[in-house]
Each structure stands twice: as C-alpha cells, then as structure tokens.
Amino acid sequence: MPDRDSYANGTGSSGGGPGGGGSEEASGAGTGSGGATSDAICRDFLRNVCKRGKRCRYRHPDMSEVSNLGVSKNEFIFCHDFQNKECSRPNCRFIHGSKEDEDGYKKTGELPPRLRQKVAAGLGLSPADLPNGKEEVPICRDFLKGDCQRGAKCKFRHLQRDFEFDARGGGGTGGGGSTGSAPPGRRHDLYDIYDLPERGFEDHEPGPKRRRGGCCPPDGPHFESYECNLAPLRGVECRLLEEENALLRKRVEELKKQVSNLLATNEVLLEQNAQFRNQAKVMTLSSTAPATEQTLAPTVGTVATFNHGIAQTHTTLSSQALQPRPVSQQELVAPTGAPAAPPTNAAPPAAPPPPPPHLNPEITPLSAALAQTIAQGMAPPPVSMAPVAVSVAPVAPVAVSMAQPLAGITMSHTTTPMVTYPIASQSMRITAMPH
C-alpha cells in the first residue's frame, strides 16, 4: 500500500488507496528476479496482477513471510492538498479529510463513519463492505472491475457490485472460495454519503456542467478515486469562476460597443440613402422640364402665328373696306322691278360694271384664306348676319328693300370714330379667336 512518507525516501509507490496499482518501478530500487534479497516487495504481486514472473525486479514474498497482509493493503492515503485548501483535482484519488481524521486513522486504523461512507461511495460499495481494520482481508479490486482471472485462488475478497458477496474468509488464501454465504449487504443510500449539513452544500448553487478533467488510464488504478463527483467548491474553483465571469463581462462590453458602432453606421447609411433619393428626384424633374418646354413652344408659336395671320387678314379687310367709293343716288333709290336709268353724264357702257363690294376679286382670296385658316384651327359654330335696313339722311326718303343686300353699313358713335364693315348677302362663318 502506498505511503506518503515513503515518497520522500524514493521507495513509495505511485498507486493510491487500497491495492494501489503502481508498477514495480514505484516499489523502490533493487535488481534480480523473484528471489531478490532487496526489501522492496512487488506490490503487483501482492495484488496477484504481476505478469512479469521471474523477470520482475522486486521480491515476490511467500504468504508465510507476510505476517500481516492487510497492513499493506488496507491503508488509505489522505489528500494533503485538500487539507491545505488547494486541491483542484475533480477526481482526486485520495481521501479528503481533515488532519485530525488522518491522525485518528493512523492511531486506530479505522476511518471515521463519515469518511467510510465517502470511500464506499467512490468504490461503489456499501460502508459495511469496507474492512473495519488493517487486519482484515482486503477487497479484490480487479473483481470489482471484472478483470480478476484468479477465481477461487484469489487471496482477496470478492464482493459483487450489487452487494451480493461471499462470506468473509479468514486467513489469506481462501477469501474468494470460502464456503457458506452471508446475507446480502444492503444497498447504500446515495443521499447519506454527501453529508450535506457538515459540508455546507446547501449554501452553494449548483455549478455549471464542465468537461471532465484528465481521467485515469484504462489500465490504471482508476478505482481508487474515492470522490469522483463529490469534490466541494473550494477556493481554486471559485477563483476560476471569478476569472471566467470577468472575461465574460469584458466580452459583453465589447459586444455592446460593436452594437453601438453598427447603429451609428446604420444611421449614416440611412442619411446617405435619403440624399441619393432626393438627388435622383431632382435630376428627373430637371430632365423632364426641357422636354415640356420644347413641346409647348411649337404650340405657342403656332397659336401666335395663327393669331397674327387672323389679325393681318382682318386688317387688310378693314383697310379695303374703309376705302371711299362713290355711291350714286340711283343705286340707292332704284326700285327692284324697274331698271335704273343711266345717268346723263355716265360713260358709255363699254366695260362691264364693277362687281359689288362683296364680290371684289381682291377681297375674295383673302376671305377664302381666312375661312380656311379658321376651319383648320377649330370647328366654330356658324354665325349669320342678317341684312339691316339703313336710311341715309341727306338723301330724300327712299324705300330700301329688306331683301336686297346693301353694299356697306355705316355705323356712327358719339365717342368713337366711324368704321365701315362690309356685309355680304350670303352667310359667312366667323369664329371668335381668343386673344
């Protein structure tokens, strides 16, 4: 069984707990075969797992030479790091107990009831299955793992994992093959092993799940880890949690800064997007305005030209109509039924009489052009002017026929100059144009 005092002398074993599974190199110096004179005893041989035989460097004692086999097999090792409040191993192989518990174990060879429950829980056994002292035959650890090939020849007690075990045999040879059977041991209560009031687990919140640390190798003595999942929350773990919380807080602050930067960038991009949209609208309006002006310009020009043509034609007609023409009294007084007598001073009828004013060849083309221009511009409503009866003051009372058209109409106004307009006997389409 490994002892911490032997580590300082270089003769201790690396295995911890009952049946430490260290190799023969940990047993101390010495050469030779199984009959070597060195005091270093092969601990694998004590566990009946040494496969080196005569090639083993350490001594393989006979059972008669080992006066007290339990002294080497039933010794438990206490964790000194736990006593110094610095044990950070999640699966510590040693017993976590106080210095007083260790001193009491060294004096009496028995563990306190509280520690017995923890050790039994780490081995998957009931506290009643643990040896009560160093004089008892130790438990076969290989059988607990299902690797014991010795059967009835095994020197250690074979206990079932479901706590149906054989009777405890005396001596060192018939532990596994003794006759008779004892009643099966009771199943241990999982809630009894935690010792909550004494350990103070009620004051702590359950810790987060973490990846399990370095486990023991499959061929190593992993059965000696007494407190696999019962490691208390100590100072080292508290410091690790505080450091992790500090790192997480820094990470949160960095993420908040990134979020604020992204929000500011988003606002700038939104402003630029709005500016680009306004510029696109201004460019569209400016490109549409010249086209509208070009479309309206010919229309205005056409209307202006049209109005100018109408005004010019009207001016020509007015100027021609205002030209004085001698009108004889016979033309005004002549009856409709009798032909007018030729005047005495009239010229011989060598040439045909001039046409009436409404049939003047100079005015006719202008009137036709005016009518064509008005008809092309828009469809006006027809306006007819009826002949008007006019009487001439200086002439004697003459009956003027209402049916006969007159050559001209003289209109007078007190405030405006006299203007003469020609009147035709036929209907004339006149359209009022907007000025």
Swiss-Prot record:
Q: Give the residue ranges for region: Disordered.
A: 1-36, 166-190, 315-363
Give the source species: Mus musculus (Mouse)
**Know the name of this protein?**
Zinc finger CCCH domain-containing protein 10
Gene Ontology terms for molecular function: miRNA binding; zinc ion binding
InterPro entries, sorted? Znf_CCCH (IPR000571)
Keyword Transferase attributed: no
Please indicate which superkingdom the organism of origin belongs to: Eukaryota
- Biased-composition ranges for Gly residues? 12-35, 168-179
Job description of the protein: Specific regulator of miRNA biogenesis. Binds, via the C3H1-type zinc finger domains, to the binding motif 5'-GCAGCGC-3' on microRNA pri-MIR143 and negatively regulates the processing to mature microRNA.
Q: Which Gene3D superfamilies does UniProt cross-reference here?
A: 3.30.1370.210
**Pfam families (UniProt xref):** zf-CCCH (PF00642), zf-CCCH_2 (PF14608)
**Annotated Pro residues bias:** 340-359
Q: Which UniProt keywords apply?
A: Coiled coil, Metal-binding, Methylation, Nucleus, Repeat, RNA-binding, Zinc, Zinc-finger
**Polar residues bias: start-end ranges:** 315-331
Show the coiled coil region(s): 235-281
Q: Could you say which residue ranges form the zinc fingers (C3H1-type)?
A: 36-63, 73-99, 134-161
Q: Name one GO cellular component term.
A: nucleus
Tell me the compartments it is located in. Answer: Nucleus
Omega-N-methylarginine sites (modified residues): R186, R187
Q: Which residues cross the membrane?
A: none
One Gene Ontology biological process: negative regulation of miRNA processing
**Chief subcellular location:** nucleus
